[in-house]
Amino acid sequence: MPITDFIINDEKTPLVLHGGPEQWKTVGPYGCFRVGICLLLVELCERFTFFEVVCNMIPFCTGRLGSYNHQAAMLNLGFIGTSVLTPVFMGWLADEYFGRNKLMYIALSLHFLGTALLSMLAFPAENFYRGAYPVFNNTSVEEQAGLFHVALLTLCLGTGGIRAVVCPPDMCGSQERESKKPMPFCNWASWSANLNAAVVFLGISSIQPLGSGALGILLPSLSVFTALVTLYLKHCDLIYRPENRCSLLTIARAFVRALKTRCLPYCHFGRDGSSWLDHAMEKQGGHHSELQEEDTRNISALLPLFSFQILYRTCLLQIPSGYYLQTMNSNRNWGGFSLPIALMNAISLLPLLILPPFMDYFSNCLLPSKRDGPFLSACMIAGNICAASSVAMAGFLEIYRKLAREQSPSGKLFSVSSMACVCLVPQYVLLGVSEVLVNPAVSMVTHRVIPGASMAFLTLSHGSACFAGAMLIKLLYLISEGNWFPNTLDKGNLENFFFVLASLMLLNILGLWRASWRYCNLNHFNAQRIRGNRCEETLLLTEKSLKFYGSTQGASSSIDLWETAL
């Protein structure tokens, strides 16, 4: 969490801390600075542990566990998706069952247990337990794989608990929801998170050449340091408690009830002209507040956008799967120095650090009147084009990589290509540029429609994209009988996988272009938002949005099937 999330004035500033909304504490500028530093350290250590596992997942699974490339890539995407979604689940457990204090201790214990088990498995023990202490030397590969999966699940639960209790997503967006200013195109909280990730990847790149022993000691040490800083925050009663509004699970539960009640009898309209969602929530009256029901109705209107987002993020997640395999099988020697794989991730973050300030200036100063209109749709379409270009470029470079294979004097071909991995930099940069364009535009659209649950629904789209990417890899592997995602890249056609993904992205772009007019007209949500009672405010905004999403209007109300097929 950046320090700028806390407003520091000359006077003492009230902060909602661990005690809840009813208990306020007065924290001065020094207290705000102390909280910011502690949260920054917690997030830095937690991110370092997470990305360290992601960067070494595929080499470990293919080298030590004997997994195929597609299995390692699917496991990596599954780990990322689970880590993205567990904060929602752990936050729900904290609010409904365990309480935030008890869950914090459980999460810290699980995080340490996961890192310790990963260190003992991944960095074996031949260097430390040779001879008298053969801890994992005598275990079979199947048992090691089972323990590895248990360690990953334990680490995911611990990471989710830390993010939910210590660094909740609501902390970044609480001040933006209360601010009367329109949401800026450049979210400085996201920019600071990207800077944090870049620092983490550079740190991993500098540590990887030291060998597995250093990494085996570092992971549990970071977990212990995270626990100490978190306990210090708990001791000083400085842990932020977000306001209890519409959570993702509450909205999903209401939407599922609505689907069960009226989805089959009423596809789009009821007998009296009102929407099937209105009938469903009327029948389920008393279960949810009016505010939650209005958010559910708005979420149903945004479903086409999030279907496009899932495929886009599936393309974006090629960095920890297909792109990693390309980098591993390319020549990483540069000037006598072996470039770590994590360095390519840091390169993909450069556009996310350089371009957002210029984009914010361009949208605010040069096009202030059109910033909330077609500009957002143009950014989303341009970002998807950049992502499709990146995947297509990866396919062509894979063809060139296989042609540039070296051979020994005896004529034996090496598995690693002579193509320098620096040639892969443009495809990483294009994915970074696409994220600069797409993520702020989608965030602004969802913030105007569902300001209370936009962060949670974006999290759901990101996590769903991880599992969708894993399913796509498995599906194409089965269809091609292993040829399009081969275990040995030189004996298969990985470029076909990239070309198929690029073709799907082109269909995604066409569908987004067809449906973009629905989201060009959402700019009035932020400008005409009425202060006061949240339920009355939501009813007014929904009344204005009905003419675009067609609960009661017959013209241009139905969503084309081919727009949502993806």
From Swiss-Prot:
InterPro entries: MFS_trans_sf, POT_fam. GO terms for cellular component: membrane. It is found in: Membrane. The chain crosses the membrane at residues 73-93, 103-123, 146-166, 184-204, 213-233, 299-319, 339-359, 379-399, 413-433, 453-473, 493-513. Its main location: membrane. Pfam families: PTR2 (PF00854). The keyword Transmembrane applies. Proton oligopeptide cotransporter. This is Solute carrier family 15 member 5. It comes from Mus musculus (Mouse). The gene is Slc15a5.
